[in-house]
């Protein structure tokens, strides 16, 4: 499925049509390269602090992106990703961490029920999963690389929302953001070995569409219910001019 594209004052971002149905209670977006102030090689909408770009430029990029999404930049909570399975419950005490205060945690997944507390996760090649529980108004954002997926970060995030907020997986909605696709993702043996261990030995011989379906079911751990999951596929390489999805 394609991503609806939005533009405002030169800033371009993508959304999930599924999550947009809940736009009155939750805001979301997948950033692109367009619409920021960073100079090469970070041009232009670089949202990654501490990577050599001007801190002032990064803050201005956040001001623009958060403004487009109508969320408070000063309360954004940034993940500190290490390709592991830690899920952090974010509270008002975490507001601004990563931009205006140091991150005293490592976590590849963030969850919250706080209002006006934007959750920010980052991706190069990896997938991003956004979760929303419309019953309890709880949200989650997950950096879902192959290591994390194989280790169960997606299941752990869903379970953490169930344990913490009372979320029912059948009522949750989820969307996976743009990432590198199989056309461009060459791996060593460690990736197929890890994913075969997670998905089952027969996964190596499944047709692509069936494997995609099983990956979705495995990744989300969501039963078909009122919510359900929606996979949004977009390989970063063909759209590399717009989306930062490959590491240098």
Describe the function of each predicted region.
Residues 1-248:
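Active-site microenvironment for binding and transforming phosphate-containing groups
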